[in-house]
Amino acid sequence: MNTLGRFLRLTTFGESHGDVIGGVLDGMPSGIKIDYALLENEMKRRQGGRNVFITPRKEDDKVEITSGVFEDFSTGTPIGFLIHNQRARSKDYDNIKNLFRPSHADFTYFHKYGIRDFRGGGRSSARESAIRVAAGAFAKMLLREIGIVCESGIIEIGGIKAKNYDFNHALKSEIFALDEEQEEAQKTAIQNAIKNHDSIGGVALIRARSIKTNQKLPIGLGQGLYAKLDAKIAEAMMGLNGVKAVEIGKGVESSLLKGSEYNDLMDQKGFLSNRSGGVLGGMSNGEEIIVRVHFKPTPSIFQPQRTIDINGNECECLLKGRHDPCIAIRGSVVCESLLALVLADMVLLNLTSKIEYLKTIYNEN
């Protein structure tokens, strides 16, 4: 399927080397001021070609809004938008058009659909994630109206872990590093991978918090069984190319702890810790929502690799083209956008949780 969300639904379309990619965001309430500067900035954060640590492919990534906006406000109807592909180079893939690139989706897409779109991976390309960032910008505009902000940064590259988290520094960092002291070592790890015609994995940290420092997030976003907030977050993140694991709060470390070590104790002011990552019973508990997203190394590397062609013959694959040496860097921005989309969807879902909410709306009329 090509749709994310239930009440705020994003449907995406397009391929890496097609004329356009785009999306339809359905369910956006009317009356939200469209922040074009925010939209442009979000696209630039994900944009390639900015430095040596990401792909050289630099698309303009101008978002063309085709519907759902009138006089700079959302109308309540589906927001349609297009992003033009202007710098695709399909010739870079001529030498591998009948080969399966190791650890790419070529193999599974071919066997599922019987079509070999060799041009940059087609629909399975990370190029599609630009649509999610654009849609995430609209979701952020909605969340801002109720005091919620999403942030992201890199906490690990090639096993080099951040010891401190500074989201303001991440905005200034070429690799969105959260720890300024570890940034140079992380950059060196990427540069060494590039020198060796290789790639490297990484981990992004995504969080949602209240815009005001003295306030909490809304309690009760999500539902207790089949629309659990943490499940929907994990689903959205795992749907992104290259993501191999998602943790909420302490995540994997939770399995190593005793209950007395893990439990978030409480007093009259609230929780004394946040090992749960802001989610209890599938619903937000008011604390910051903390998500860690683990990315595999980019499968596109410039080393000879053993593979097979579409006829099953063994052969050697040597790639050309423009690729991210570490997909976690730009991927962190996409994950931030996905968290915004999930939270906006849960905010709209929550309107049905109490009759008082409906009475508030309809008694005013």
UniProtKB/Swiss-Prot annotation:
* Record's GO cellular component terms: cytosol
Name the PROSITE patterns on file.
CHORISMATE_SYNTHASE_1, CHORISMATE_SYNTHASE_2, CHORISMATE_SYNTHASE_3
Reactions it catalyzes: 5-O-(1-carboxyvinyl)-3-phosphoshikimate = chorismate + phosphate
Top class in the EC scheme:
lyase
Q: Where does FMN bind?
A: R123, S124, S125, N241, G242, G281, K296, P297, T298, P299, S300, R322
**Cofactor(s) for this protein?**
FMNH2
Cofactor note text: Reduced FMN (FMNH(2)).
Q: Which GO terms describe its molecular function?
A: chorismate synthase activity; FMN binding
According to its UniProt record, in which pathway does this protein act?
Metabolic intermediate biosynthesis; chorismate biosynthesis; chorismate from D-erythrose 4-phosphate and phosphoenolpyruvate: step 7/7
Q: Does the keyword field hold Flavoprotein? A: yes
Q: What does the entry list as the binding residues for NADP(+)?
A: R46
Write out the entry's keywords from A to Z. Answer: Amino-acid biosynthesis, Aromatic amino acid biosynthesis, FAD, Flavoprotein, FMN, Lyase, NADP
Cite the EC number.
4.2.3.5
Which GO terms are recorded in the biological process aspect for this UniProt protein? Answer: amino acid biosynthetic process; aromatic amino acid family biosynthetic process; chorismate biosynthetic process
Tell me if tRNA processing is a UniProt keyword of this record. no
> Which range is the signal sequence, renumbered to this chain?
none
What PANTHER family does its record include? CHORISMATE SYNTHASE
Subunit structure, as described in the record: Homotetramer.
Role this protein plays = This reaction introduces a second double bond into the aromatic ring system.
What protein family is recorded? Answer: Belongs to the chorismate synthase family.
User: What is the official name of this protein in its record?
Assistant: Chorismate synthase
